């Protein structure tokens, strides 16, 4: 059984179990207590954010759909995939120098999150570039192929590793005061990812009022 089929089976099993248990045992990420929701006028102003949405992964042999929850900051990332009923089936927690993946009751570790995810799941997902694309930004290895009438990227090619990633920004939305993508489609060879951001929240340090102790 290939890795994607194994993960698909895991998600289906968790979905069935959660239906029987009426959501008993659902897991959630601990809150980032040092960060609070903020409003920005440009997504580039947010050094940290969290999102909720849906992720679809498709290969010639299989396909997978899951809810995605992602908290991102410059120091760490916390990514979770769940069934439609909310049961956690995969968590990936990482810092610039370490990564921990929990899936199917097993724990895996590496010093690189992207390499770890590819080794265990078989997915070559550009985790280092996704935070830029999720906020509508373009990286140094990205070549913009087309822009919309407002100058936002509509399609780009990432040339860092062959074959290149083709990224399409299908729609945009206003979240936390900024314009961010609503739907993204990523293609590389025979691997296709679709990401829908249902909620994107910019995060920052809580403001300290005059007279309060820091």
From Swiss-Prot:
<keyword id="KW-0732">Signal</keyword>
<keyword id="KW-0564">Palmitate</keyword>
<keyword id="KW-0143">Chaperone</keyword>
<keyword id="KW-0813">Transport</keyword>
<feature type="lipid moiety-binding region" description="N-palmitoyl cysteine">
    <location>
        <position position="26"/>
    </location>
</feature>
<comment type="similarity">
    <text>Belongs to the LolB family.</text>
</comment>
<keyword id="KW-0449">Lipoprotein</keyword>
<dbReference type="Pfam" id="PF03550">
    <property type="entry name" value="LolB"/>
</dbReference>
<dbReference type="InterPro" id="IPR029046">
    <property type="entry name" value="LolA/LolB/LppX"/>
</dbReference>
<feature type="signal peptide">
    <location>
        <begin position="1"/>
        <end position="25"/>
    </location>
</feature>
<keyword id="KW-0472">Membrane</keyword>
<dbReference type="GO" id="GO:0009279">
    <property type="term" value="C:cell outer membrane"/>
</dbReference>
<protein>
    <recommendedName>
        <fullName>Outer-membrane lipoprotein LolB</fullName>
    </recommendedName>
</protein>
<comment type="subunit">
    <text>Monomer.</text>
</comment>
<comment type="function">
    <text>Plays a critical role in the incorporation of lipoproteins in the outer membrane after they are released by the LolA protein.</text>
</comment>
<dbReference type="GO" id="GO:0044874">
    <property type="term" value="P:lipoprotein localization to outer membrane"/>
</dbReference>
<dbReference type="GO" id="GO:0015031">
    <property type="term" value="P:protein transport"/>
</dbReference>
<keyword id="KW-0998">Cell outer membrane</keyword>
<feature type="lipid moiety-binding region" description="S-diacylglycerol cysteine">
    <location>
        <position position="26"/>
    </location>
</feature>
<dbReference type="InterPro" id="IPR004565">
    <property type="entry name" value="OM_lipoprot_LolB"/>
</dbReference>
<keyword id="KW-0653">Protein transport</keyword>
């Amino acid at each position: 059984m290939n890795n994607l089929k194994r993960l698909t089976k895991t998600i289906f099993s968790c979905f069935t179990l959660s239906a029987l248990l009426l959501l008993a045992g659902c897991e959630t990420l601990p809150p980032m207590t040092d960060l609070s929701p903020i409003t920005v006028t440009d997504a580039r102003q947010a050094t940290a954010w969290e999102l909720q949405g849906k992720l679809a992964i498709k290969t010639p042999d299989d396909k997978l759909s899951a809810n995605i929850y992602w908290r991102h900051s410059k120091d760490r990332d916390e990514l979770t995939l769940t069934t439609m009923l909310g049961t956690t089936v995969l968590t990936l927690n990482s810092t610039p120098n370490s990564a921990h993946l929990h899936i199917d009751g097993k724990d895996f570790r590496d010093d690189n999150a992207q390499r770890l995810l590819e080794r265990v799941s078989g997915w070559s997902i550009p985790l280092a570039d996704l935070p830029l694309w999720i906020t509508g930004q373009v990286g140094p290895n990205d070549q913009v192929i087309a822009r919309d009438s407002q100058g936002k990227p509509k399609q780009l090619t990432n040339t860092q590793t062959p074959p290149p990633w083709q990224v399409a920004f299908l729609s945009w939305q206003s979240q936390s005061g900024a314009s961010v993508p609503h739907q993204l489609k990523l293609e590389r060879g025979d691997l296709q990812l679709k990401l829908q951001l249902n909620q994107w929240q910019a995060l920052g340090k809580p403001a300290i009022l005059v007279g309060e102790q820091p």
